[in-house]
Structures are given as structure tokens and as C-alpha cells.
């Protein structure tokens, strides 16, 4: 791998990959935020804020054979902007302040999406189980991967570089496995909103679907950028 460290830092292809990932990720974030801002100005007909939507769904929606109070142990408010998430470890559902407090179409969709994750866990979703298995490795894999990749370049050690690529591949697998999890959660969210009568108009349905689609695109962007980066590392290894 002679002189490969110089190739890594000054290779035009590396700059192209970096710019592409920034554009893709930035574009996805811009789209989700603009979509959220649009539908966060539209009140939902049920006049329910995000926390109330989550509570209604917990009481009325289906979670396999598990009661809603077991599928979602607690609904809490957390700081941050669009920091909403469902934690499968303790089955807690966290909503950001804006989502929890506003009775809008956007808040309704975001809250329902997180409840959708609770339904996935209760029903034993295979994709969610696969993603959960990858979480520990995906949390530390990329950081360790960069150390091996940079070390392999500096030391001209093909073995180290290869290990780094394999470790980074775990993060790529996690990103790819996340896609069906998020898409399925969104599908469940729309179905639950309709089945429980929270959605009462085509406008609300279209708005919720727009929100959920925009959210899904952020995960598509993450997967695409991870794949592009992995392909660059593989290309670099082959020509070094």
C-alpha cells in the first residue's frame, strides 16, 4: 500500500465522496425539517398533541397479544428537536417537547411512528430483532474502523485496512437493516391512526404520510452515504 496515505487525504475521489455524502445527508435533513415545519402549522381535527396521540394509541391500538400498557411502559418528554424515539430495552416512548405539546398533524405523525416501533417489538418483528442485534457493534464499529483504516494507510498494512473495512461494513449493515424497520413502523403508524379514528380527513392522511415519508428518507440517505463510503474504502484498498 505504498503512498496510500497520501492518496487517502488528497484523492479527488475522496473529495467527491465527501461532497456527495454531505449533499445527500443535508438534503434529507432539509426536507424533513421543511416538511415538519409545514405540517406543524396544520392542527389535527382531534385536537390531540403528540403525547395525547401516543396515549390514545397505547389504549386503543393493537400490540400483538400484549396490552398497550406493557408494550409502552411510559410516555415521557425529552429535550431536543425531533429527538423522538422508542427504546426497546425498557419499552419507553420519548417525545420531544415540540411534538409532545402541539396538536398538529406533524406531531400526530411523529408520535404514531414511535408507537409503531412499540407495536413492532410487541409483535416480534424480525427486522427489528436483526437491527437490535447489530446495535452494539454499530455503536463502536465505525470509530474502531477508522482507527484500523487510518493505521493501515499510515503503516502500509493491508491487514489492518481490511479489518477496518469489515468493521465499517457492520455500520452499513445496520443502516440497511434500519430501512425496513422504519418503513414498517410508518405503515403501522398510518394504520393505527386510521383504525382508532384519530385521522378524520384526506388532508390529515396526506400530511401524516408526507411526514412519515420525509422521515424515512433520512434513513435512506444514511444508508446511501454509508454504502458510498464503504465502496470508496474498497476502491482505495484495491488500487493501493
PLM feature segments, named:
Residues 142, 148-149, 165-166:
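Glycine- and Gly-Pro-enriched alpha-helical subdomains that act as flexible
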Residues 147-151, 230:
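Alpha-helical transmembrane segments of multipass membrane proteins
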Residues 2-5, 26-141, 173-231, 235-240:
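Polar-ligand-bearing catalytic/cofactor-coordination segments
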Amino acid at each position: 500500500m505504498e503512498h496510500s496515505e497520501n492518496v487517502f487525504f488528497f484523492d479527488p475521489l475522496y473529495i467527491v465522496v465527501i461532497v456527495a455524502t454531505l449533499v445527500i445527508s443535508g438534503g434529507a435533513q432539509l426536507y424533513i425539517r421543511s416538511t415538519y415545519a409545514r405540517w406543524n402549522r396544520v392542527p389535527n381535527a382531534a385536537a390531540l398533541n403528540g403525547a395525547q396521540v401516543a396515549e390514545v394509541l397505547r389504549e386503543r391500538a393493537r400490540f400483538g397479544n400484549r396490552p398497550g400498557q406493557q408494550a409502552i411502559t411510559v410516555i415521557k418528554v425529552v429535550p431536543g428537536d425531533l429527538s423522538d424515539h422508542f427504546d426497546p430495552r425498557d419499552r419507553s416512548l420519548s417525545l420531544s417537547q415540540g411534538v409532545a405539546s402541539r396538536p398538529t398533524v406533524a406531531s400526530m405523525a411523529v408520535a404514531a411512528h414511535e408507537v409503531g416501533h412499540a407495536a413492532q417489538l410487541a409483535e416480534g418483528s424480525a427486522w427489528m430483532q436483526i437491527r437490535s442485534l447489530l446495535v452494539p457493534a454499530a455503536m463502536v464499529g465505525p470509530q474502531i474502523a477508522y482507527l484500523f483504516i487510518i493505521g493501515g494507510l499510515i503503516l502500509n498494512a493491508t491487514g489492518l485496512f481490511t479489518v477496518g473495512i469489515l468493521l465499517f461494513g457492520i455500520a452499513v449493515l445496520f443502516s440497511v437493516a434500519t430501512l425496513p424497520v422504519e418503513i414498517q413502523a410508518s405503515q403501522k403508524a398510518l394504520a393505527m391512526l386510521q383504525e382508532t379514528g384519530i385521522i378524520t380527513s384526506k388532508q390529515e392522511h396526506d400530511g401524516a404520510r408526507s411526514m412519515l415519508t420525509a422521515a424515512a428518507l433520512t434513513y435512506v440517505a444514511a444508508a446511501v452515504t454509508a454504502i458510498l463510503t464503504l465502496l470508496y474504502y474498497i476502491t482505495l484498498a484495491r488500487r493501493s
